């Protein structure tokens, strides 16, 4: 009898815990994905802060030339970063217990791998938590679908790209100038500016910003006045009101006359779906582009593609870009390679686009 009561009490305790985890009445919804998300993001955040402030230099290239990334070792907010795991580690899973000591783990950049893996699990769980809360509230699942775009982008630069390149040292550093360095080196090695999927991503981000600004300004310009001239228009809106707060017909008419009739949406639902889908699809395509370039399926190469009738090269902007790529590749990791692969495997390229005339 006593054992039965204990089992019932423990079962009730578990049921109460489950009800609390999945309750939509909490100030912040936790959910089962939140059980995984919270410790992962807390771990990633705490280790990032500690490493950014105090981590010792990391031998990123695996050639015994440590690179300083933390504030305590001479960096500032702009130059500081969590330096990626050493090239000597490659793609090996490198938790603390795999190193001979904590000093060795820090020297080989173990914190980077710890932060990145916990962060990716955390943001993926956040996406799942969005779906879970939508499901509990009876909503459609498009919020988590939209968030899948930044999740895909983060996964591409922090996981897929290092896998394709064979080392976590090729992942994006966790800092401002480190991010810029990653972008420049990525351009030098993969010609990302000439990749169609990157172009689609640029169109998605800038187009999304443009459409957001257009939509916000149109709505703000066609608000239905519910207040006097001496009050803010915003005071005319009551949360949860059933009537429209702006005149969609006026906004539609304005924009249709500004551009042309069919450039303006007459359906608010399809308009907002478009506003959500445009940047999401663009960022999806960029993440796919990064993931393909990770395995060296690079951007288009139009170098020396225009020649005259006598076979002489007429340089285009593609050749200028190629020259910049070679220059960046020469400068980065200058002690890790004897010579950049692109330069070593091709014929000699003249430094100047045209040879200067020399007077005798």
Curated annotation (Swiss-Prot):
Name the propeptide positions.
Answer: 345-360
Q: Which residues bind [CaMn4O5] cluster?
A: 170, 189, 332-333, 342, 344
User: Which parts of the chain span the membrane according to its record?
Assistant: 29-46, 118-133, 142-156, 197-218, 274-288
| Cofactor binding note of this UniProt entry | The D1/D2 heterodimer binds P680, chlorophylls that are the primary electron donor of PSII, and subsequent electron acceptors. It shares a non-heme iron and each subunit binds pheophytin, quinone, additional chlorophylls, carotenoids and lipids. D1 provides most of the ligands for the Mn4-Ca-O5 cluster of the oxygen-evolving complex (OEC). There is also a Cl(-1) ion associated with D1 and D2, which is required for oxygen evolution. The PSII complex binds additional chlorophylls, carotenoids and specific lipids.
Question: Where Fe cation is bound, by residue?
Answer: 215, 272
Which residues bear the site annotation Tyrosine radical intermediate?
A: 161
Q: What is its main location?
A: plastid
**Which EC class is the enzyme in?**
oxidoreductase
The entry marks the following residues as binding a quinone, namely 215, 264-265
Positions of the site: Cleavage?
Answer: 344-345
* Coiled-coil positions: none
- Taken from the record, one Pfam family name reads Photo_RC
Q: Name one GO molecular function term.
A: iron ion binding
- Protein residues bound to chlorophyll a PD1: 198
Q: Name the keywords, alphabetized.
A: Calcium, Chlorophyll, Chloroplast, Chromophore, Electron transport, Herbicide resistance, Iron, Magnesium, Manganese, Membrane, Metal-binding, Oxidoreductase, Photosynthesis, Photosystem II, Plastid, Thylakoid, Transmembrane, Transmembrane helix, Transport
Of the GO CC terms on this record, one is: chloroplast thylakoid membrane
Q: What is its EC number?
A: 1.10.3.9
Give the site residues for Stabilizes free radical intermediate: 190
Cross-referenced HAMAP family: PSII_PsbA_D1 (MF_01379)
How it assembles, according to the record, is: PSII is composed of 1 copy each of membrane proteins PsbA, PsbB, PsbC, PsbD, PsbE, PsbF, PsbH, PsbI, PsbJ, PsbK, PsbL, PsbM, PsbT, PsbX, PsbY, PsbZ, Psb30/Ycf12, at least 3 peripheral proteins of the oxygen-evolving complex and a large number of cofactors. It forms dimeric complexes.
Q: What does this protein do?
A: Photosystem II (PSII) is a light-driven water:plastoquinone oxidoreductase that uses light energy to abstract electrons from H(2)O, generating O(2) and a proton gradient subsequently used for ATP formation. It consists of a core antenna complex that captures photons, and an electron transfer chain that converts photonic excitation into a charge separation. The D1/D2 (PsbA/PsbD) reaction center heterodimer binds P680, the primary electron donor of PSII as well as several subsequent electron acceptors.
Any additional notes?
Answer: 2 of the reaction center chlorophylls (ChlD1 and ChlD2) are entirely coordinated by water. Herbicides such as atrazine, BNT, diuron or ioxynil bind in the Q(B) binding site and block subsequent electron transfer.
Its recorded name reads: Photosystem II protein D1
Species of origin reads Cyanidioschyzon merolae (strain NIES-3377 / 10D)
At the highest ranks, the source species' classification is: Eukaryota, Rhodophyta, Bangiophyceae, Cyanidiales, Cyanidiaceae
């Amino acid at each position: 009898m006593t054992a039965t009561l204990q089992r019932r009490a423990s079962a009730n305790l578990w049921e109460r815990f489950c009800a609390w985890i999945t309750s939509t009445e909490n100030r912040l919804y936790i959910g089962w994905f939140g059980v995984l998300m919270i410790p992962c993001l807390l771990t990633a955040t705490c280790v990032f802060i500690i490493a950014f402030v105090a981590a010792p230099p990391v031998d990123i290239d695996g050639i015994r030339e440590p690179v300083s990334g933390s504030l305590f070792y001479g960096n500032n907010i702009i130059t500081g970063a969590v330096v990626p795991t050493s090239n000597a580690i490659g793609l090996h899973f490198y938790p603390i217990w795999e190193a001979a000591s904590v000093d060795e783990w820090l020297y080989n950049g173990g914190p980077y791998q710890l932060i990145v893996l916990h962060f990716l699990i955390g943001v993926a769980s956040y996406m799942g938590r969005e779906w879970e809360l939508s499901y509990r509230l009876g909503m459609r699942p498009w919020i988590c679908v939209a968030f899948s775009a930044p999740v895909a982008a983060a996964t591409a630069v922090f996981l897929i790209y290092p896998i394709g390149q064979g080392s976590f040292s090729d992942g994006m550093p966790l800092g401002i100038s480190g991010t810029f360095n990653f972008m420049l080196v990525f351009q030098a090695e993969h010609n990302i500016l000439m990749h169609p999927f990157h172009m689609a991503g640029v169109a998605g981000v800038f187009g999304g910003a443009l459409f957001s600004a257009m939509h916000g300004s149109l709505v703000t310009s066609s608000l239905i006045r519910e207040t006097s001239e001496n009050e803010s228009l915003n005071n005319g809106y009551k949360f949860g009101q059933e009537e429209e707060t702006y005149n969609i017909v006026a906004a539609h008419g304005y924009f249709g006359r500004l551009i042309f009739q069919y450039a303006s949406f007459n359906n608010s639902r399809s308009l907002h779906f478009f506003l959500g889908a445009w940047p999401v699809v663009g960022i999806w395509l960029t993440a796919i582009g990064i993931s393909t370039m990770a395995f060296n399926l690079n951007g288009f190469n139009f170098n020396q593609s225009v020649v005259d009738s006598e076979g002489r090269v007429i340089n285009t902007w593609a050749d200028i870009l190629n020259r910049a790529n070679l220059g960046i590749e020469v400068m980065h990791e200058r002690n890790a390679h004897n010579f950049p692969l692109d330069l070593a495997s091709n014929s000699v390229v003249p430094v100047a686009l045209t040879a200067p005339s020399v007077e005798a």
